[in-house]
Amino acid sequence: PRPLVAASAPQVFVQFAHVAMHLSPERTVEVGAATVGIACTYEGRPGHYVLTMPMEGEFVVIGGREKFGEPKKIAETKFRIEGDRVNAQVIRHGIPFLELEGRIGGESDGPKKFTEHLFCYKAMPSCQPEKSTNGGFDGDVLLTQLNWERDYTSLRRLEEGKIILRESARDPLVDIPVKRILRMEYAEGASKTGGEVLCSVP
């Protein structure tokens, strides 16, 4: 959607994460999460337009939606490692609509320290849409940019990788064809997340 511009290659970013959120020295909350985005640019800056962010934990979902406009949904996630095999699933309404699996291989030649940019739209639906002069919203629709600063301690290839999409009326990712996997990796380390408002969208 404008003002984002589709990337020259139709590529999709899929991430599964098992996150330990250090809310205070005494309190750490662990959640599972996934992010799916489409490659795009904003004023020449590469990133991904976020299609969905299913994750565990109501407070995490509400906070991300209200602050950054992230399209988060409450979901069940499963992430397990057995030997050198990795399997991750996202489940909503009893359907494992997104699944990833692979075998942990050798060190990847990808970067361990970098910043990723993702784009979202933050908007407040109007309580009186029939009277709205702004397309059914109260106030401006804002394009936001998420800035994820990665600092990995380990980055390894995932061999024999698969991404499995299943039919779900509420989560229709299966409509996106998986033609080939360009790169799949297993990372350990830390991420510092933040964001900013880029512009109002008329």
What are these model-predicted stretches?
Residues 71-202:
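Interaction-surface and assembly-scaffold signal
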Residues 21-101:
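Aromatic- and glycine-enriched beta-alpha-beta binding-site module
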Residues 1-20:
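N-terminal ordered "arm"
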Residues 14-18, 30, 67-68, 142-144, ...:
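A short linear-motif detector with a strong N-terminal bias
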Residues 6-11, 51, 60-62, 155:
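N-terminal start-of-chain detector that recognizes signal peptides
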Residues 4-6, 64, 69, 153, ...:
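Homeobox/homeodomain signature
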Residues 1-5, 25, 37-39, 151:
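Intrinsically disordered, low-complexity boundary segments flanking structured domains
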